[in-house]
Amino acid sequence: MGNQMSVPLRPGDQEHDPGADTCKVTSDNECVQNGNPVVLSTRVIQHYEEVDLGISSSKDNVATSSPKTMEAQAVGDASGKNLGKEAKTKAPAARSHFFLTLSRPVPGRPGDQGTDSSAASGRFDVSPSAAPENKDPSEHGALPVAAAPGQAPDKTPGCPEAKQQTLPATGPLAPSPPESQAEAPAQDKDFGFLNRFFKLDKGRESAPVNSQPKEAKGSEDPEQATEAPAVPGNPHGVSAGEDIVDSEQRGQDVDTLSYSVPGDPEVPGTTKEDPQVVDTTENSSSIMSFFKTLVSPNKTETKKDPEDTKATKADSVCDGHAAGQKMSETQAKSKKKRLDSPRLGLSFRKLFRHKDTENSPTTSANLKSDKANFTPQETRGKTKATKSCSPPPPPPEPTSEGRDSGKEKAGPTSLPLGKLFWKKSVKEDTLSTGAEENAVCESPVETVRLEEVESSLQTVDLSEETQPEPTDVKVKEESKPRKTPLMAFLRQMSVRSSEGIPRSEESNVKDSSCQTSNSVEKTPSPPEPEPAGTAQKNKETSSSKDKKSVDKKSATENSKQKNGKQEVREPAPCVQPPTVEANAMQTGDKTPKKSEKRRQSLGGFLKGLGPKRMSDAQVQTDPVSIGPVGKSK
């Protein structure tokens, strides 16, 4: 495409006398054959016979730039040093090749050059005479993609290679140039079409546009690198004026073409740097904004999260429903950490806020229902009170145990939060001494219920904390309605011991045994100012129980039948200590000394209770059964 515009200038060149053209041919051939004008004189004579062909062939060399000729000359560059001698020997073959071109008609050249085979053969043969065209790209370096691949190869180092290829095989090489030249405009059309296509889709796909102008620049850079030696390598001093004129005119044509026809690649070429910079800036800005949106909402979330968690923690501390809300909070935190997009973060934040607002009224409703359920449980004294996890600040025995169970369950599920919660609950318990006193008075009941609640560790800690405290405050805070649940619990305990221990308790006997051993070791530690009445009876019953339990151990080791008989015998003596304790409780709420008595009587009862339960469950744990027996004896 770009060569058609430069062709009409050549008829003007035909007006020059043929002498100048022959000078051009001789100078070019001198460049090719390393200074052998003798062999070339015959050629020059032949060109004098038909001057038109020489002129046209020398002027059609602009169109010889095709990828195939580029490849041929590039192949020749590798062995271009020894081409001079070969050219000398094969001069007559070149003459025969020129006769082939002379027989072809010339007048089709101003038209389409891609389809004219005669023009193509002439161009390919006289390709060494492209010296005047070598100045064009050097003077006009900014050639577009369409004209770039064409004019690069016609440099002076490439002249001998083209000559060498045309000389040995005249017949087969003659038809090949039309294909090459047909490909050159086809590539130009492809470049133009692709450039237009990508120009239309430049907004959609900026990456291919950027990649294509890069290729264009890559093709132009080696051209300019090869053009630099091309300027001094043209020893055409004879026809310098005509060469300059032709090169200027052709350069103008090529420039007009480069801005008109292949102007498409130049527009993306100019925009090539801009879209990259803009894209990088946009990408960086978008990435930074994305990270900002990622970072800033998360920071606000992390700032808001502690508040929410504090509020929910306060609610859960007040309500006793620690485990469920903690799990929901931890899940919410984990989900919020996993969120990547700010929109999702906002939606999930709204969701979790709604959930928190829903949780707080439900917990308050649970509080009310627990308070409502609390009075009949207090009267009944059932062990189901462990399920009501929300006690008022002066709680009776079952609700304090329920709180302990809630702590125990919250601890293993969420360890770090559970530790924080544990400390808070322990502080609250230390503040409310009534609850602690209840826990101490409850110790027999809790030892019975340890299988269900599994709060042995906390009860032991509370008993440790409450032992050094003065008993006057506890006696003052004791109220008369607390007698009834203690009595009810003792009665239930006696009934349970008579009926036997259920399987769930049997599975958890080991925990309870550890608890009983610890409590037995700790309860006899305070001084023992025991009055003669109830405490001695309790100790007698406990010692008798211990002896029986030791006997039972030997019996169980011997045979299981004896164990069954002794289990049948035991319920009667185990009913006795609850009644004794009930009498002690009825008599002893008036003075602190009697409260101490009750505490030690409970300790003795614990001593008797541990081995009895172990024998009932038929689970022998030696340290629990043997240790307390030795101490009691």
UniProtKB/Swiss-Prot annotation:
Residue pairs linked by disulfide bridges in the UniProt entry: none
Protein name: Breast carcinoma-amplified sequence 1 homolog
GO MF, one example: protein homodimerization activity
Predominant location: cytoplasm
UniProt-listed GO biological process terms: myelination
Modified residues (Phosphoserine): S127, S328, S360, S425, S443, S525, S601, S615
Superkingdom of the organism of origin: Eukaryota
Organism, scientific name: Mus musculus
Gene null: resulting phenotype: Mice display hypomyelination, schizophrenia-like behavioral abnormalities and a tendency toward reduced anxiety-like behaviors and up-regulation of inflammatory genes in the brain.
Keywords for this protein: Cytoplasm, Phosphoprotein
Record flagged with keyword Zinc-finger: no
Annotated localization: Cytoplasm
Region Disordered, residue ranges: 1-34, 57-422, 454-633
Function: Required for myelination.
